[in-house]
């Protein structure tokens, strides 16, 4: 069972998973703003993962009667780009409408690809992807790589790590203008919006609305959240020295650790020695995936996973918010990043009052685009509705949300 010292150590390690300061001459477009505070004025139009689908975005804005001149604030939950036909068009629309956005995992990789292009390393990294693809065709990599090189982070070297960016990310980076790249790079990791005190109905009687792409770890302050996790997470596991960690959880912990180091190397232009030091740091944090359980116990702080193994983070967040007696200390999270599950907007999948709303409707896979429209009521409170259009542009009916 995890002790208080174990919990303090894990929290410190989670808070410490940040990119170290680097030379500005070699680090392009790293994440500069962790949390940005936004004032609630007019309606909030919070749009799910667009993934370069400009016609769906235009249809959605038309359906919600978006009007910037009337005070509407357009917000994107990240992943505006990649996988679709017109990422430059989507980004330009966001710029033209003074929209707010957060950095999703796709923006992060494309910005890392742009950094590599600026350093003249794109050809080398693309060639490495081609070599990996050829090797995968010839052999079953999972069977031929020794177990220790996969599971023991201290035995991993830089050449064992895949590039952080996919091959397609370089083409996406090249398709965007300098202005569009700079705009994407300027967006924060998290948006925080203070809600009016007059609201009395759950969940809008909470004190804060948060927009984060992938998820958040309960009990960790926003400023201390691990950026990689905020952009990529779906599940949580908990420290438990007596637990027999499943192979699936262990593999995902190791995968996430390597991905963090790949991100570090991409944005830092890091040396082999610096990458080795980061791998050692991650090894100390994750202990090769041992001693973690997917079973939540009161008081434990979760460790984020990219997969849904263990405890789903939205369940953990909803439990935590419902345990806070003062409603004004509670926080609603609107997020994206989970196309496989799709929209998560109602009470049906939560055993407690919902304080999380997932807006990734699967636009990247032809399943339409959705937005949450948050508006002030006559009594000063708030209400919301979910509006969706399908991939062909034929809008579906509005669904009333909590008021």
Model-derived features: positions:
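Divalent metal-coordination and catalytic microenvironments
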Residues: 49, 79, 94, 104-105, ...
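N-terminal active-site segment of His-dependent metallophosphoesterases
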Residues: 2-91
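Active-site environment of divalent metal-dependent phosphoester hydrolases
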Residues: 51-55, 82-85, 106-111, 217-219, ...
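Active-site neighborhood of divalent metal-dependent phosphoester bond hydrolases
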Residues: 70, 87-247
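A short acidic-Thr-Gly-centered motif at the start of a beta-strand
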Residues: 32-40, 66, 91-94, 191-204, ...
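Acidic, His/Gly-rich catalytic cores of divalent-metal-dependent hydrolytic chemistry
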Residues: 4-23, 39, 231-403
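Active-site-proximal beta-strand elements of phosphoester/diester hydrolases
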Residues: 43-51, 209-215, 357-359
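Residue-level marker for buried hydrophobic side chains located in beta-strands
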Residues: 46, 76, 101-102, 210, ...
């Amino acid at each position: 069972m995890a002790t208080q010292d174990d919990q303090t150590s894990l929290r410190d390690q989670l808070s410490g998973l940040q990119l170290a300061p680097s030379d500005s001459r070699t680090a392009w477009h790293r994440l500069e703003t962790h949390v940005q505070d936004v004032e609630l004025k007019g309606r909030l139009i919070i749009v799910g993962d667009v993934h370069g689908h400009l016609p769906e975005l235009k249809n959605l804005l038309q359906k919600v009667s978006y009007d910037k001149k009337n005070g509407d604030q357009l917000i994107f939950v990240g992943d505006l780009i990649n996988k679709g036909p017109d990422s430059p068009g989507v980004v330009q629309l966001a710029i033209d409408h003074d929209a707010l956005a957060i950095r999703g995992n796709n923006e992060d990789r494309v910005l890392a690809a742009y950094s590599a292009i600026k350093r003249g390393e794109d050809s080398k990294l693309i060639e490495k992807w081609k070599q990996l693809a050829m090797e995968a065709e010839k052999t079953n990599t999972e069977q031929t790589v020794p177990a220790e090189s996969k599971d023991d982070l201290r035995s991993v070297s830089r050449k064992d790590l895949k590039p952080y960016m996919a091959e397609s990310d370089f083409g996406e980076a090249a398709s965007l203008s300098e202005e569009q790249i700079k705009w994407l790079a300027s967006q924060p990791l998290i948006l925080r919006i203070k809600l009016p005190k007059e609201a009395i109905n759950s969940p809008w009687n909470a004190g804060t609305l948060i927009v984060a792409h992938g998820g958040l770890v309960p009990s960790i302050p926003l400023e201390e959240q691990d950026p990689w996790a905020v952009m990529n997470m779906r599940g949580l596991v908990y420290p438990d020295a007596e637990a027999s960690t499943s192979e699936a959880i262990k593999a995902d912990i190791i995968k996430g650790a390597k991905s963090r180091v790949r991100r570090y190397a991409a944005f830092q232009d890091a040396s082999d020695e610096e990458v080795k030091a980061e791998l050692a740091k991650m090894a100390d944090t994750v202990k090769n995936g041992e001693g973690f359980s997917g079973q939540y116990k009161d008081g434990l702080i979760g460790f984020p996973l990219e997969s849904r193994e263990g405890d789903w983070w939205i369940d953990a967040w909803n439990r935590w918010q419902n345990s806070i007696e003062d409603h004004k200390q509670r926080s609603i999270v609107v997020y994206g990043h989970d196309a496989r599950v799709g929209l998560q907007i109602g009470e049906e999948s939560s055993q407690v009052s919902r304080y999380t709303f997932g807006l990734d409707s699967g636009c990247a896979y032809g399943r339409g685009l959705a937005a949450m429209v948050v508006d002030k009521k006559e009594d000063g409170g708030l209400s919301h509705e979910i509006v969706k259009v399908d991939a062909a542009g034929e809008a579906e009916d509005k669904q009333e949300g909590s008021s």
